[in-house]
Amino acid sequence: HMDIENNQRYVIVSGVGNNGGDGLGLARQLTAHGKEVEVFIVGKIEKMSECSKINYNILKAMNISTNIVDEENLEYLKCSVKKSDIVVDCIFGRS
């Protein structure tokens, strides 16, 4: 359960599978509620599940910040996490 009323800044770290697609969908919903959202994707875009691809394309069309996690932007990810109110892990799902 997340208290979206009392939190403004969100970082969502998503994988490229279906759980990651759920995270990208969450980013869309939080943005629609006026929240500041940054998305960090772990994995290769070309390996995204269909669910992730659909939500990724919607995020791009909405101009929501999406970043591919690599060695060059790890410090940016760390900085964003420190400034956020909530970090959501959408890398791995349950099996």
How should each PLM-predicted stretch be described?
Residues 1:
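N-terminal glycine-/serine-/threonine-rich phosphate-binding loop
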Residues 4-13, 18-95:
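Glycine-rich phosphate/dinucleotide-binding loop and adjoining beta-alpha-beta core of small-molecule
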